[in-house]
Amino acid sequence: MIYWIFLGLAIIAEIIGTLSMKYASVSGEMTGHIVMYFMITGSYVMLSLAVKKVALGVAYALWEGIGILIITIFSVMWFGETLSPLKIAGLVTLIGGILLVKSGTRKPKQPNRHRGNRPPSVQGLKTQTTGHHKGVAVESGEHHAAA
């Protein structure tokens, strides 16, 4: 659970950092650059913590995808950017992709405990001796030099 919180914090930090970058470029104020540097750095730190338990592909898709959606909305509201029908279609497609990636994440089933901790494909196999060569057993499929 904590790793998903790290991912959420990474997304929030990325959004703030990216919007601060735009603010700094529009206003020319140094404050935007400083906020951007700290937030983008914090975003990567939180993302690196999140991927300890959240699959990298899922974490990155959510981090970028949700970030793009929210940054686009705020860019329209705060910076007067426009949303064309093609951009809207792209955002809807992005939402669908995020949902598909997230729904495809399942915890892997715990492997069954087999005797001797051998994988099932090796369990029933027994070594077969095919013959003797100067007192040395030769196993099938292997070639041993006589000593």
UniProtKB/Swiss-Prot annotation:
The keyword Membrane applies. It is found in: Cell inner membrane. GO terms for cellular component: plasma membrane. GO terms for biological process: glycine betaine transport. Disulfide bonds: none annotated. It comes from the Bacteria. Residues 105-117 have a biased composition (Basic residues). Gene3D superfamilies: 1.10.3730.20. SUPFAM superfamilies: Multidrug resistance efflux transporter EmrE (SSF103481). It is a multi-pass membrane protein. One of its GO terms (molecular function) is amino-acid betaine transmembrane transporter activity. The chain crosses the membrane at residues 1-21, 31-51, 54-74, 81-101. Pfam families: Multi_Drug_Res. The keyword tRNA processing does not apply. Keywords: Cell inner membrane, Cell membrane, Membrane, Transmembrane, Transmembrane helix, Transport. Residues 105-147 are annotated as: Disordered. Belongs to the drug/metabolite transporter (DMT) superfamily. Small multidrug resistance (SMR) (TC 2.A.7.1) family. MdtJ subfamily. Forms a complex with MdtI. Catalyzes the excretion of spermidine. This is Spermidine export protein MdtJ. It comes from Yersinia pseudotuberculosis serotype O:1b (strain IP 31758). The lineage of its organism: Bacteria, Pseudomonadati, Pseudomonadota, Gammaproteobacteria, Enterobacterales. The gene is mdtJ.
